[in-house]
Protein backbone atom coordinates (compact mmCIF):
# COMPACT_ATOMS: atom_id res chain seq x y z
CA UNK A 1 0.00 0.00 0.00
CA UNK A 2 1.49 3.34 -1.09
CA UNK A 3 1.70 6.04 1.61
CA UNK A 4 0.12 9.48 1.33
CA UNK A 5 3.51 11.14 0.81
CA UNK A 6 4.22 9.03 -2.26
CA UNK A 7 0.69 9.53 -3.58
CA UNK A 8 1.04 13.29 -3.36
CA UNK A 9 4.43 13.06 -5.05
CA UNK A 10 2.91 10.97 -7.85
CA UNK A 11 0.07 13.47 -8.35
CA UNK A 12 2.56 16.32 -8.34
CA UNK A 13 4.48 14.64 -11.15
CA UNK A 14 1.40 14.77 -13.39
CA UNK A 15 1.09 18.48 -12.85
CA UNK A 16 4.74 19.03 -13.73
CA UNK A 17 6.42 18.57 -10.34
CA UNK A 18 9.38 16.28 -9.60
CA UNK A 19 8.87 12.48 -9.66
CA UNK A 20 8.85 10.59 -6.34
CA UNK A 21 12.26 10.36 -4.76
CA UNK A 22 14.27 7.14 -4.54
CA UNK A 23 14.21 7.38 -0.78
CA UNK A 24 10.43 7.25 -0.77
CA UNK A 25 10.37 4.22 -3.06
CA UNK A 26 12.95 2.40 -0.94
CA UNK A 27 10.88 3.07 2.16
CA UNK A 28 7.79 1.65 0.48
CA UNK A 29 9.67 -1.45 -0.68
CA UNK A 30 11.11 -1.90 2.79
CA UNK A 31 7.62 -1.69 4.29
CA UNK A 32 6.34 -4.32 1.88
CA UNK A 33 9.24 -6.61 2.67
CA UNK A 34 8.77 -6.06 6.40
CA UNK A 35 5.14 -7.12 6.18
CA UNK A 36 6.24 -10.27 4.30
CA UNK A 37 9.02 -11.15 6.72
CA UNK A 38 8.62 -13.71 9.47
CA UNK A 39 10.88 -14.45 12.43
CA UNK A 40 11.17 -18.01 13.72
CA UNK A 41 12.89 -18.52 17.06
CA UNK A 42 14.08 -22.10 17.41
CA UNK A 43 15.76 -23.01 20.67
CA UNK A 44 16.79 -19.39 21.25
CA UNK A 45 18.26 -18.88 17.78
CA UNK A 46 16.31 -16.42 15.64
CA UNK A 47 15.88 -17.10 11.94
CA UNK A 48 14.41 -14.48 9.61
CA UNK A 49 12.91 -15.30 6.23
CA UNK A 50 9.99 -14.48 3.95
CA UNK A 51 6.58 -16.06 4.02
CA UNK A 52 6.91 -16.80 0.32
CA UNK A 53 9.97 -18.93 1.13
CA UNK A 54 7.99 -21.02 3.59
CA UNK A 55 5.23 -21.53 1.03
CA UNK A 56 7.62 -23.39 -1.30
CA UNK A 57 6.87 -26.66 0.54
CA UNK A 58 3.11 -26.76 1.06
CA UNK A 59 1.71 -29.07 3.68
CA UNK A 60 4.65 -28.69 6.06
CA UNK A 61 4.64 -27.07 9.46
CA UNK A 62 6.41 -23.92 8.34
CA UNK A 63 4.01 -23.56 5.43
CA UNK A 64 1.20 -23.48 7.98
CA UNK A 65 2.91 -20.55 9.70
CA UNK A 66 3.09 -18.64 6.43
CA UNK A 67 -0.65 -19.09 5.92
CA UNK A 68 -2.23 -19.59 9.37
CA UNK A 69 -5.76 -18.93 8.08
CA UNK A 70 -5.58 -21.54 5.31
CA UNK A 71 -7.81 -24.53 5.64
CA UNK A 72 -5.72 -27.03 3.70
CA UNK A 73 -3.72 -28.47 6.56
CA UNK A 74 -3.01 -32.18 6.37
CA UNK A 75 -4.26 -34.52 9.04
CA UNK A 76 -0.99 -35.12 10.83
CA UNK A 77 0.34 -34.68 14.29
CA UNK A 78 0.64 -31.00 14.96
CA UNK A 79 1.99 -31.15 18.47
CA UNK A 80 5.33 -32.84 18.27
CA UNK A 81 7.60 -33.63 21.17
CA UNK A 82 8.39 -30.59 23.25
CA UNK A 83 7.08 -28.02 20.79
CA UNK A 84 5.38 -24.73 21.53
CA UNK A 85 4.66 -21.63 19.57
CA UNK A 86 4.76 -18.14 21.02
CA UNK A 87 4.83 -14.59 19.91
CA UNK A 88 8.08 -12.95 20.65
CA UNK A 89 6.86 -9.43 20.53
CA UNK A 90 9.28 -7.23 18.66
CA UNK A 91 9.10 -8.90 15.32
CA UNK A 92 10.09 -5.72 13.63
CA UNK A 93 7.66 -3.87 11.48
CA UNK A 94 4.71 -5.97 10.49
CA UNK A 95 6.54 -9.26 11.00
CA UNK A 96 5.75 -11.63 13.86
CA UNK A 97 7.91 -14.08 15.77
CA UNK A 98 7.17 -17.73 16.45
CA UNK A 99 9.02 -19.79 19.02
CA UNK A 100 9.68 -23.53 18.80
CA UNK A 101 11.57 -25.43 21.46
CA UNK A 102 13.44 -27.61 18.98
CA UNK A 103 17.05 -28.21 17.90
CA UNK A 104 18.38 -24.92 16.46
CA UNK A 105 21.24 -26.49 14.50
CA UNK A 106 19.02 -28.90 12.59
CA UNK A 107 16.50 -26.16 11.87
CA UNK A 108 19.17 -24.25 9.95
CA UNK A 109 19.36 -27.16 7.49
CA UNK A 110 15.56 -27.38 7.36
CA UNK A 111 15.20 -23.68 6.59
CA UNK A 112 17.95 -23.91 3.98
CA UNK A 113 15.90 -26.67 2.33
CA UNK A 114 13.06 -24.18 1.89
CA UNK A 115 15.47 -21.68 0.36
CA UNK A 116 17.45 -23.91 -1.99
CA UNK A 117 15.29 -26.99 -2.44
CA UNK A 118 18.15 -29.29 -1.32
CA UNK A 119 18.09 -31.11 2.00
CA UNK A 120 21.46 -32.02 3.47
CA UNK A 121 22.17 -33.98 6.63
CA UNK A 122 24.58 -32.51 9.21
CA UNK A 123 27.48 -34.78 10.02
CA UNK A 124 27.69 -33.68 13.67
CA UNK A 125 24.08 -34.60 14.53
CA UNK A 126 22.95 -38.07 15.53
CA UNK A 127 20.78 -39.77 12.94
CA UNK A 128 17.72 -40.41 15.15
CA UNK A 129 17.69 -36.76 16.22
CA UNK A 130 17.73 -35.56 12.62
CA UNK A 131 14.98 -38.04 11.75
CA UNK A 132 12.81 -36.77 14.61
CA UNK A 133 13.31 -33.18 13.53
CA UNK A 134 12.33 -33.98 9.95
CA UNK A 135 9.20 -35.69 11.24
CA UNK A 136 8.31 -32.71 13.41
CA UNK A 137 8.70 -30.19 10.60
CA UNK A 138 6.72 -32.42 8.24
CA UNK A 139 9.54 -33.16 5.77
CA UNK A 140 9.87 -36.52 4.05
CA UNK A 141 13.17 -38.30 4.61
CA UNK A 142 13.32 -39.28 0.94
CA UNK A 143 14.11 -35.63 0.15
CA UNK A 144 17.62 -36.04 1.61
CA UNK A 145 20.27 -35.48 -1.04
CA UNK A 146 22.18 -38.54 -2.34
CA UNK A 147 25.48 -37.17 -1.04
CA UNK A 148 24.13 -37.27 2.53
CA UNK A 149 21.97 -40.38 2.28
CA UNK A 150 24.66 -42.74 3.58
CA UNK A 151 25.27 -40.48 6.57
CA UNK A 152 21.55 -40.37 7.24
CA UNK A 153 21.15 -44.16 6.85
CA UNK A 154 24.09 -44.98 9.07
CA UNK A 155 22.11 -44.84 12.30
CA UNK A 156 19.29 -46.92 10.84
CA UNK A 157 21.71 -49.60 9.69
CA UNK A 158 23.12 -49.71 13.21
CA UNK A 159 19.63 -50.02 14.67
CA UNK A 160 18.76 -52.83 12.27
CA UNK A 161 21.97 -54.58 13.28
CA UNK A 162 21.02 -54.21 16.94
CA UNK A 163 17.56 -55.60 16.23
CA UNK A 164 18.90 -58.85 14.79
CA UNK A 165 21.77 -59.06 17.25
CA UNK A 166 20.88 -60.41 20.66
CA UNK A 167 22.29 -58.65 23.66
CA UNK A 168 25.89 -59.79 24.28
CA UNK A 169 25.07 -60.76 27.87
CA UNK A 170 22.83 -63.65 27.02
CA UNK A 171 19.60 -62.09 25.87
CA UNK A 172 18.60 -60.49 29.13
CA UNK A 173 20.89 -57.55 28.91
CA UNK A 174 22.49 -58.33 32.23
CA UNK A 175 19.32 -57.17 33.86
CA UNK A 176 19.60 -56.25 37.46
CA UNK A 177 16.78 -55.86 39.93
CA UNK A 178 16.00 -52.32 38.84
CA UNK A 179 16.96 -52.57 35.21
CA UNK A 180 14.22 -51.27 32.96
CA UNK A 181 15.06 -53.64 30.10
CA UNK A 182 15.18 -56.61 32.43
CA UNK A 183 11.82 -55.71 33.94
CA UNK A 184 10.32 -55.49 30.46
CA UNK A 185 11.71 -58.92 29.59
CA UNK A 186 10.26 -60.42 32.75
CA UNK A 187 6.90 -58.75 32.19
CA UNK A 188 6.83 -60.06 28.63
CA UNK A 189 7.65 -63.56 29.83
CA UNK A 190 4.86 -63.41 32.40
CA UNK A 191 2.41 -62.28 29.74
CA UNK A 192 3.39 -65.15 27.44
CA UNK A 193 3.09 -67.67 30.27
CA UNK A 194 -0.51 -66.69 30.89
CA UNK A 195 -2.50 -64.41 33.19
CA UNK A 196 -2.49 -66.77 36.20
CA UNK A 197 0.93 -68.30 35.75
CA UNK A 198 3.00 -65.53 37.19
CA UNK A 199 2.39 -66.44 40.80
CA UNK A 200 0.59 -63.18 41.61
CA UNK A 201 -3.08 -62.86 41.16
CA UNK A 202 -6.33 -64.56 41.99
CA UNK A 203 -5.32 -67.85 40.40
CA UNK A 204 -1.86 -67.97 41.87
CA UNK A 205 -2.83 -70.48 44.53
CA UNK A 206 -3.56 -73.36 42.18
CA UNK A 207 -0.77 -72.64 39.73
CA UNK A 208 1.81 -71.18 42.09
CA UNK A 209 4.50 -73.52 40.86
CA UNK A 210 4.16 -72.01 37.40
CA UNK A 211 5.35 -68.71 38.86
CA UNK A 212 8.87 -70.13 38.89
CA UNK A 213 8.92 -70.54 35.14
CA UNK A 214 10.38 -67.10 34.32
CA UNK A 215 13.02 -67.56 37.01
CA UNK A 216 13.94 -71.03 35.81
CA UNK A 217 14.03 -69.79 32.23
CA UNK A 218 16.39 -66.98 33.19
CA UNK A 219 18.45 -69.43 35.25
CA UNK A 220 19.23 -71.64 32.24
CA UNK A 221 19.01 -69.06 29.45
CA UNK A 222 20.46 -65.81 30.82
CA UNK A 223 23.88 -66.33 32.45
CA UNK A 224 23.96 -62.73 33.69
CA UNK A 225 20.59 -62.68 35.45
CA UNK A 226 21.94 -63.95 38.79
CA UNK A 227 24.88 -65.68 40.43
CA UNK A 228 23.08 -69.01 40.26
CA UNK A 229 22.61 -68.50 36.52
CA UNK A 230 26.35 -67.96 36.15
CA UNK A 231 27.01 -71.21 38.00
CA UNK A 232 24.59 -73.04 35.69
CA UNK A 233 26.24 -71.47 32.65
CA UNK A 234 29.67 -72.53 33.90
CA UNK A 235 28.41 -76.09 34.47
CA UNK A 236 26.89 -76.20 30.98
CA UNK A 237 30.14 -74.95 29.47
CA UNK A 238 32.10 -77.56 31.43
CA UNK A 239 29.90 -80.45 30.24
CA UNK A 240 30.07 -79.22 26.64
CA UNK A 241 33.86 -79.24 26.70
CA UNK A 242 33.96 -82.65 28.42
CA UNK A 243 31.54 -84.14 25.88
CA UNK A 244 33.57 -82.86 22.93
CA UNK A 245 36.80 -84.12 24.52
CA UNK A 246 35.25 -87.55 25.08
CA UNK A 247 34.07 -87.66 21.48
CA UNK A 248 37.59 -87.00 20.24
CA UNK A 249 39.24 -89.52 22.61
CA UNK A 250 36.90 -92.31 21.50
CA UNK A 251 38.68 -92.38 18.14
CA UNK A 252 42.15 -92.84 19.67
CA UNK A 253 43.69 -96.30 19.66
CA UNK A 254 44.58 -96.12 23.34
CA UNK A 255 40.90 -96.00 24.30
CA UNK A 256 39.74 -98.75 21.90
CA UNK A 257 39.59 -102.40 23.00
CA UNK A 258 39.71 -105.22 20.45
CA UNK A 259 37.50 -108.15 21.37
CA UNK A 260 37.04 -111.49 19.62
CA UNK A 261 33.44 -112.57 19.37
CA UNK A 262 32.40 -116.16 18.63
CA UNK A 263 29.03 -116.74 17.00
CA UNK A 264 27.43 -120.17 16.73
CA UNK A 265 24.70 -120.65 14.14
CA UNK A 266 22.63 -123.83 13.92
CA UNK A 267 20.57 -124.60 10.86
CA UNK A 268 18.89 -127.97 11.29
CA UNK A 269 21.61 -130.51 12.04
CA UNK A 270 24.37 -128.22 10.81
CA UNK A 271 26.25 -126.06 13.29
CA UNK A 272 28.55 -123.32 12.09
CA UNK A 273 30.97 -121.27 14.15
CA UNK A 274 32.01 -117.78 13.10
CA UNK A 275 34.67 -115.59 14.59
CA UNK A 276 34.63 -111.83 14.27
CA UNK A 277 36.40 -108.90 15.87
CA UNK A 278 34.69 -105.99 17.54
CA UNK A 279 36.12 -102.71 18.73
CA UNK A 280 34.74 -101.40 22.00
CA UNK A 281 35.36 -98.08 23.66
CA UNK A 282 36.75 -97.85 27.16
CA UNK A 283 33.85 -98.02 29.65
CA UNK A 284 35.09 -94.93 31.47
CA UNK A 285 34.46 -92.81 28.39
CA UNK A 286 30.97 -94.26 28.06
CA UNK A 287 30.19 -93.39 31.68
CA UNK A 288 31.49 -89.85 31.23
CA UNK A 289 29.38 -89.42 28.11
CA UNK A 290 26.37 -90.75 30.01
CA UNK A 291 26.79 -88.15 32.76
CA UNK A 292 27.09 -85.38 30.17
CA UNK A 293 23.98 -86.57 28.34
CA UNK A 294 22.04 -86.64 31.62
CA UNK A 295 22.96 -83.00 32.21
CA UNK A 296 22.03 -82.00 28.68
CA UNK A 297 18.72 -83.86 29.03
CA UNK A 298 17.89 -82.07 32.27
CA UNK A 299 18.82 -78.74 30.76
CA UNK A 300 16.76 -79.39 27.64
CA UNK A 301 13.66 -80.48 29.59
CA UNK A 302 13.79 -77.50 31.96
CA UNK A 303 14.19 -75.06 29.12
CA UNK A 304 11.37 -76.51 27.02
CA UNK A 305 8.99 -76.59 30.01
CA UNK A 306 9.78 -73.05 31.17
CA UNK A 307 10.18 -71.36 27.81
CA UNK A 308 7.85 -68.37 27.17
CA UNK A 309 7.11 -69.48 23.61
CA UNK A 310 7.28 -73.18 22.76
CA UNK A 311 7.06 -72.60 19.01
CA UNK A 312 10.06 -70.26 19.01
CA UNK A 313 11.94 -72.74 21.18
CA UNK A 314 11.32 -75.60 18.77
CA UNK A 315 12.37 -73.51 15.77
CA UNK A 316 15.65 -72.45 17.38
CA UNK A 317 18.63 -74.07 15.66
CA UNK A 318 20.62 -74.58 18.87
CA UNK A 319 17.70 -76.39 20.50
CA UNK A 320 17.40 -78.67 17.47
CA UNK A 321 21.11 -79.46 17.78
CA UNK A 322 20.61 -80.32 21.47
CA UNK A 323 17.84 -82.77 20.69
CA UNK A 324 19.66 -84.42 17.77
CA UNK A 325 22.82 -84.83 19.86
CA UNK A 326 20.97 -86.37 22.82
CA UNK A 327 18.69 -88.82 20.99
CA UNK A 328 21.36 -91.21 19.53
CA UNK A 329 22.80 -91.97 22.97
CA UNK A 330 19.48 -93.20 24.35
CA UNK A 331 18.77 -95.22 21.20
CA UNK A 332 22.18 -96.84 21.40
CA UNK A 333 21.70 -97.73 25.06
CA UNK A 334 18.26 -99.16 24.37
CA UNK A 335 19.39 -101.31 21.43
CA UNK A 336 22.70 -102.47 22.89
CA UNK A 337 21.15 -105.56 24.53
CA UNK A 338 19.56 -106.82 21.32
CA UNK A 339 21.37 -109.37 19.16
CA UNK A 340 19.23 -109.33 16.05
CA UNK A 341 20.67 -108.26 12.74
CA UNK A 342 18.32 -105.27 12.49
CA UNK A 343 19.44 -104.06 15.91
CA UNK A 344 23.08 -104.38 14.90
CA UNK A 345 22.43 -102.42 11.72
CA UNK A 346 20.73 -99.66 13.69
CA UNK A 347 23.60 -99.58 16.17
CA UNK A 348 26.07 -99.29 13.33
CA UNK A 349 24.13 -96.38 11.91
CA UNK A 350 23.95 -94.69 15.32
CA UNK A 351 27.70 -95.00 15.73
CA UNK A 352 28.09 -93.19 12.44
CA UNK A 353 25.63 -90.53 13.55
CA UNK A 354 27.73 -89.85 16.63
CA UNK A 355 29.41 -87.05 14.73
CA UNK A 356 26.41 -84.80 15.53
CA UNK A 357 27.79 -84.57 19.05
CA UNK A 358 30.46 -82.28 17.71
CA UNK A 359 27.71 -79.80 16.88
CA UNK A 360 27.43 -79.07 20.59
CA UNK A 361 30.33 -76.72 20.07
CA UNK A 362 27.81 -74.23 18.70
CA UNK A 363 26.20 -74.04 22.14
CA UNK A 364 29.23 -72.01 23.16
CA UNK A 365 27.69 -69.09 21.30
CA UNK A 366 25.43 -68.57 24.32
CA UNK A 367 28.46 -67.77 26.45
CA UNK A 368 30.91 -66.03 24.08
CA UNK A 369 30.19 -62.76 22.33
CA UNK A 370 32.75 -63.35 19.59
CA UNK A 371 31.07 -66.55 18.41
CA UNK A 372 27.69 -64.81 18.21
CA UNK A 373 29.28 -61.97 16.29
CA UNK A 374 30.80 -64.47 13.87
CA UNK A 375 27.43 -66.14 13.31
CA UNK A 376 25.68 -62.84 12.63
CA UNK A 377 28.52 -61.79 10.35
CA UNK A 378 28.13 -64.93 8.25
CA UNK A 379 24.39 -64.38 7.96
CA UNK A 380 24.80 -60.71 7.11
CA UNK A 381 27.46 -61.48 4.50
CA UNK A 382 25.38 -63.97 2.53
CA UNK A 383 25.41 -61.82 -0.59
CA UNK A 384 29.17 -61.44 -0.44
CA UNK A 385 29.64 -65.19 -0.07
CA UNK A 386 27.39 -65.85 -3.04
CA UNK A 387 29.37 -63.31 -5.05
CA UNK A 388 32.61 -65.02 -4.04
CA UNK A 389 31.27 -68.44 -5.07
CA UNK A 390 30.16 -67.09 -8.44
CA UNK A 391 33.58 -65.54 -9.07
CA UNK A 392 35.33 -68.78 -8.14
CA UNK A 393 33.00 -70.88 -10.28
CA UNK A 394 33.64 -68.70 -13.32
CA UNK A 395 37.39 -68.77 -12.75
CA UNK A 396 37.46 -72.53 -12.23
CA UNK A 397 35.52 -73.16 -15.43
CA UNK A 398 37.67 -70.80 -17.50
CA UNK A 399 41.09 -71.90 -16.25
CA UNK A 400 40.26 -75.63 -16.23
CA UNK A 401 39.39 -75.37 -19.91
CA UNK A 402 42.47 -73.28 -20.66
CA UNK A 403 44.88 -75.64 -18.87
CA UNK A 404 43.45 -78.66 -20.70
CA UNK A 405 44.05 -77.20 -24.14
CA UNK A 406 47.34 -75.53 -23.13
CA UNK A 407 48.82 -78.87 -22.08
CA UNK A 408 47.82 -80.48 -25.39
CA UNK A 409 50.06 -78.05 -27.29
CA UNK A 410 53.22 -79.93 -26.31
CA UNK A 411 51.87 -83.38 -27.12
CA UNK A 412 53.94 -85.76 -29.25
CA UNK A 413 52.69 -86.71 -32.73
CA UNK A 414 52.54 -90.35 -31.67
CA UNK A 415 50.03 -89.51 -28.94
CA UNK A 416 46.60 -89.24 -30.55
CA UNK A 417 44.90 -88.21 -27.30
CA UNK A 418 47.62 -85.72 -26.42
CA UNK A 419 47.52 -86.42 -22.69
CA UNK A 420 50.23 -89.03 -22.07
CA UNK A 421 52.72 -86.40 -20.95
CA UNK A 422 50.39 -84.50 -18.59
CA UNK A 423 48.07 -85.10 -15.63
CA UNK A 424 45.23 -83.11 -17.17
CA UNK A 425 43.44 -85.94 -18.95
CA UNK A 426 40.14 -84.06 -19.20
CA UNK A 427 38.48 -80.80 -18.18
CA UNK A 428 36.71 -82.12 -15.01
CA UNK A 429 40.11 -83.10 -13.58
CA UNK A 430 41.23 -79.54 -14.29
CA UNK A 431 38.47 -78.27 -11.97
CA UNK A 432 40.33 -79.62 -8.94
CA UNK A 433 43.60 -78.04 -10.06
CA UNK A 434 41.89 -74.68 -10.71
CA UNK A 435 40.25 -74.64 -7.25
CA UNK A 436 43.53 -75.51 -5.51
CA UNK A 437 45.44 -72.90 -7.51
CA UNK A 438 42.91 -70.06 -7.20
CA UNK A 439 42.72 -70.52 -3.42
CA UNK A 440 46.57 -70.46 -3.32
CA UNK A 441 46.77 -73.90 -1.66
CA UNK A 442 48.93 -75.65 -4.27
CA UNK A 443 49.00 -79.29 -3.15
CA UNK A 444 51.39 -80.24 -5.96
CA UNK A 445 49.56 -83.41 -6.96
CA UNK A 446 48.81 -81.86 -10.38
CA UNK A 447 50.89 -79.22 -12.11
CA UNK A 448 51.46 -78.08 -15.73
CA UNK A 449 54.54 -79.34 -17.57
CA UNK A 450 54.52 -77.21 -20.73
CA UNK A 451 55.38 -73.54 -21.11
CA UNK A 452 51.83 -72.72 -22.18
CA UNK A 453 50.41 -74.59 -19.18
CA UNK A 454 52.75 -72.71 -16.83
CA UNK A 455 51.52 -69.41 -18.24
CA UNK A 456 47.91 -70.43 -17.64
CA UNK A 457 48.82 -71.53 -14.10
CA UNK A 458 50.35 -68.12 -13.33
CA UNK A 459 47.27 -66.32 -14.61
CA UNK A 460 45.05 -68.65 -12.56
CA UNK A 461 46.94 -67.87 -9.34
CA UNK A 462 46.76 -64.10 -9.92
CA UNK A 463 43.05 -64.27 -10.73
CA UNK A 464 42.43 -66.27 -7.57
CA UNK A 465 44.16 -63.70 -5.37
CA UNK A 466 42.17 -60.83 -6.89
CA UNK A 467 38.88 -62.73 -6.81
CA UNK A 468 39.11 -63.65 -3.13
CA UNK A 469 40.43 -60.23 -2.12
CA UNK A 470 37.39 -58.30 -3.41
CA UNK A 471 34.55 -59.58 -1.14
CA UNK A 472 36.73 -60.13 1.92
CA UNK A 473 36.88 -56.44 3.03
CA UNK A 474 33.08 -56.28 3.07
CA UNK A 475 32.91 -59.34 5.30
CA UNK A 476 35.59 -57.90 7.58
CA UNK A 477 33.67 -54.61 7.83
CA UNK A 478 30.51 -56.49 8.80
CA UNK A 479 32.39 -58.34 11.51
CA UNK A 480 33.89 -55.10 12.79
CA UNK A 481 30.49 -53.41 12.87
CA UNK A 482 28.82 -56.26 14.76
CA UNK A 483 31.70 -56.61 17.17
CA UNK A 484 31.80 -52.90 17.96
CA UNK A 485 28.03 -52.90 18.52
CA UNK A 486 28.30 -55.91 20.81
CA UNK A 487 31.10 -54.35 22.83
CA UNK A 488 29.32 -51.01 23.07
CA UNK A 489 26.09 -52.66 24.18
CA UNK A 490 27.95 -54.73 26.72
CA UNK A 491 29.57 -51.64 28.26
CA UNK A 492 26.41 -49.55 28.32
CA UNK A 493 25.34 -48.63 31.86
CA UNK A 494 22.17 -50.24 33.03
CA UNK A 495 19.06 -48.11 32.61
CA UNK A 496 17.18 -47.80 35.85
CA UNK A 497 13.53 -47.02 36.09
CA UNK A 498 13.11 -43.32 36.67
CA UNK A 499 10.36 -41.63 38.58
CA UNK A 500 8.22 -39.76 36.07
CA UNK A 501 6.23 -36.96 37.75
CA UNK A 502 2.57 -36.80 36.95
CA UNK A 503 1.55 -34.00 34.59
CA UNK A 504 -0.16 -31.02 36.23
CA UNK A 505 -3.91 -31.29 36.37
CA UNK A 506 -6.09 -28.85 34.51
CA UNK A 507 -7.34 -27.35 37.76
CA UNK A 508 -3.81 -26.88 39.07
CA UNK A 509 -2.73 -23.22 39.47
CA UNK A 510 0.59 -23.97 37.70
CA UNK A 511 -1.09 -25.41 34.61
CA UNK A 512 -1.70 -22.00 33.04
CA UNK A 513 0.93 -19.29 32.92
CA UNK A 514 0.32 -15.57 33.03
CA UNK A 515 2.40 -12.74 31.70
CA UNK A 516 4.02 -12.15 35.08
CA UNK A 517 5.29 -15.74 35.42
CA UNK A 518 6.08 -16.49 31.78
CA UNK A 519 9.25 -15.20 30.10
CA UNK A 520 7.39 -14.85 26.80
CA UNK A 521 4.99 -12.10 25.87
CA UNK A 522 2.34 -14.37 24.44
CA UNK A 523 1.90 -17.95 23.38
CA UNK A 524 1.77 -19.62 19.99
CA UNK A 525 1.54 -23.24 19.01
CA UNK A 526 0.40 -25.36 16.12
CA UNK A 527 -3.00 -26.65 15.32
CA UNK A 528 -3.14 -30.36 16.04
CA UNK A 529 -5.40 -32.79 14.17
CA UNK A 530 -7.20 -33.95 17.32
CA UNK A 531 -8.32 -30.39 17.79
CA UNK A 532 -9.54 -30.28 14.19
CA UNK A 533 -11.45 -33.51 14.58
CA UNK A 534 -13.09 -32.62 17.90
CA UNK A 535 -13.54 -28.96 17.11
CA UNK A 536 -11.51 -25.96 18.12
CA UNK A 537 -10.76 -26.04 21.84
CA UNK A 538 -12.35 -23.02 23.48
CA UNK A 539 -10.35 -20.94 25.90
CA UNK A 540 -12.73 -19.42 28.37
CA UNK A 541 -11.53 -16.68 30.61
CA UNK A 542 -13.26 -14.84 33.40
CA UNK A 543 -12.46 -11.38 34.64
CA UNK A 544 -11.58 -11.45 38.30
CA UNK A 545 -12.79 -8.24 39.94
CA UNK A 546 -10.88 -8.88 43.17
CA UNK A 547 -7.35 -8.59 41.74
CA UNK A 548 -8.06 -7.41 38.21
CA UNK A 549 -6.13 -10.32 36.71
CA UNK A 550 -7.40 -12.75 34.07
CA UNK A 551 -7.50 -16.38 35.17
CA UNK A 552 -7.48 -19.02 32.45
CA UNK A 553 -9.97 -21.81 32.92
CA UNK A 554 -10.39 -24.76 30.60
CA UNK A 555 -13.68 -26.53 30.14
CA UNK A 556 -14.27 -30.04 31.49
CA UNK A 557 -14.66 -31.40 27.99
CA UNK A 558 -11.25 -30.08 27.05
CA UNK A 559 -9.72 -31.48 30.20
CA UNK A 560 -11.11 -34.92 29.47
CA UNK A 561 -9.87 -34.76 25.90
CA UNK A 562 -6.37 -33.76 26.95
CA UNK A 563 -5.86 -35.97 29.97
CA UNK A 564 -7.18 -39.16 28.43
CA UNK A 565 -4.19 -39.82 26.13
CA UNK A 566 -1.79 -39.02 28.97
CA UNK A 567 -3.21 -41.80 31.12
CA UNK A 568 -2.36 -44.54 28.65
CA UNK A 569 0.87 -46.25 29.68
CA UNK A 570 2.85 -48.14 27.04
CA UNK A 571 3.08 -51.88 27.28
CA UNK A 572 6.46 -53.65 27.55
CA UNK A 573 6.30 -54.57 23.84
CA UNK A 574 5.70 -50.92 22.93
CA UNK A 575 8.57 -49.74 25.12
CA UNK A 576 10.89 -52.26 23.48
CA UNK A 577 9.72 -51.23 20.01
CA UNK A 578 10.29 -47.57 20.86
CA UNK A 579 13.83 -48.27 22.01
CA UNK A 580 14.67 -50.37 18.93
CA UNK A 581 13.26 -47.97 16.42
CA UNK A 582 15.34 -45.16 17.84
CA UNK A 583 12.34 -42.95 18.80
CA UNK A 584 13.36 -40.85 21.74
CA UNK A 585 10.38 -38.64 22.36
CA UNK A 586 10.38 -37.61 25.99
CA UNK A 587 7.26 -35.47 25.97
CA UNK A 588 4.06 -37.20 24.90
CA UNK A 589 1.70 -34.23 25.25
CA UNK A 590 0.14 -33.02 22.01
CA UNK A 591 -1.84 -29.91 22.83
CA UNK A 592 -4.30 -27.96 20.75
CA UNK A 593 -2.90 -24.56 19.84
CA UNK A 594 -3.56 -21.36 17.91
CA UNK A 595 -1.55 -19.10 15.64
CA UNK A 596 -2.48 -15.72 17.10
CA UNK A 597 -0.65 -12.49 16.49
CA UNK A 598 0.42 -10.13 19.24
CA UNK A 599 -2.42 -7.79 20.07
CA UNK A 600 -5.17 -10.35 19.44
CA UNK A 601 -7.64 -11.01 22.22
CA UNK A 602 -9.28 -14.28 23.19
CA UNK A 603 -12.87 -13.60 24.16
CA UNK A 604 -15.07 -15.45 26.61
CA UNK A 605 -17.27 -16.78 23.84
CA UNK A 606 -14.31 -18.54 22.21
CA UNK A 607 -13.76 -16.01 19.40
CA UNK A 608 -10.64 -14.00 18.63
CA UNK A 609 -10.80 -10.27 18.04
CA UNK A 610 -8.26 -7.76 16.86
CA UNK A 611 -6.92 -4.97 18.97
CA UNK A 612 -9.10 -1.88 18.75
CA UNK A 613 -12.36 -3.81 18.59
CA UNK A 614 -12.40 -5.19 22.10
CA UNK A 615 -15.00 -4.89 24.76
CA UNK A 616 -13.59 -3.96 28.16
CA UNK A 617 -14.50 -7.09 30.11
CA UNK A 618 -15.35 -9.60 27.42
CA UNK A 619 -11.82 -10.39 26.22
CA UNK A 620 -8.36 -10.76 27.65
CA UNK A 621 -4.99 -10.33 25.89
CA UNK A 622 -3.36 -13.31 24.24
CA UNK A 623 -0.39 -12.85 26.56
CA UNK A 624 -2.46 -14.66 29.20
CA UNK A 625 -3.23 -17.62 26.96
CA UNK A 626 -2.50 -21.00 28.55
CA UNK A 627 0.80 -22.57 27.53
CA UNK A 628 0.00 -26.19 26.86
Curated annotation (Swiss-Prot):
Predominant cellular place of this UniProt entry's protein: membrane
Modification after translation, per record: Phosphorylation of serine residues in the inactivation gate inhibits rapid channel closure.
Intervals of motif Selectivity filter: 440-445
Membrane-spanning ranges: 231-251, 282-302, 317-337, 349-368, 385-405, 456-476
InterPro entries assigned: BTB/POZ_dom, Ion_trans_dom, K_chnl_volt-dep_Kv, K_chnl_volt-dep_Kv3, K_chnl_volt-dep_Kv3.4, Shal-type_N, SKP1/BTB/POZ_sf, T1-type_BTB
Catalytic activity line of the entry: K(+)(in) = K(+)(out)
Molecular functions (GO terms): metal ion binding; voltage-gated potassium channel activity
Sugar-bearing residue positions: 260, 269
Membrane-topology descriptor: Multi-pass membrane protein
Residue spans of biased composition, Basic and acidic residues class: 531-546
Modified residues (Phosphoserine): 8-9, 15, 21
Residues annotated for K(+) binding in this entry: 440-443
Keyword annotations of the record: Glycoprotein, Ion channel, Ion transport, Membrane, Metal-binding, Phosphoprotein, Potassium, Potassium channel, Potassium transport, Transmembrane, Transmembrane helix, Transport, Voltage-gated channel, Zinc
UniProt key word Ribonucleoprotein: no
One cellular component term from this protein's GO annotations in UniProt: voltage-gated potassium channel complex
GO annotation, biological process: protein homooligomerization; regulation of neurotransmitter secretion
Chain ranges on the Cytoplasmic side, renumbered to this chain: 1-230, 303-316, 369-384, 477-628
Region (Inactivation gate): 1-28
Keyword field contains Coiled coil: no
Binding site for Zn(2+): 120, 126, 147-148
Biased segments, Gly residues type: 77-88
Assembly: Homotetramer. Heterotetramer of potassium channel proteins.
Domain comment, as recorded: The cytoplasmic N-terminus mediates N-type inactivation. Composed of the tetramerization T1 domain, six membrane spanning regions including voltage-sensing (S1-S4) and pore domains (S5- S6) and a variable C-terminal domain.
Described purpose of this protein according to its UniProt entry: Voltage-gated potassium channel that opens in response to the voltage difference across the membrane, forming a potassium-selective channel through which potassium ions pass in accordance with their electrochemical gradient. The channel displays rapid activation and inactivation kinetics.
Family, as annotated: Belongs to the potassium channel family. C (Shaw) (TC 1.A.1.2) subfamily. Kv3.4/KCNC4 sub-subfamily.
Protein name: Voltage-gated potassium channel KCNC4
Originating species: Mus musculus (Mouse)
Biological classification of the source: Eukaryota, Metazoa, Chordata, Craniata, Vertebrata
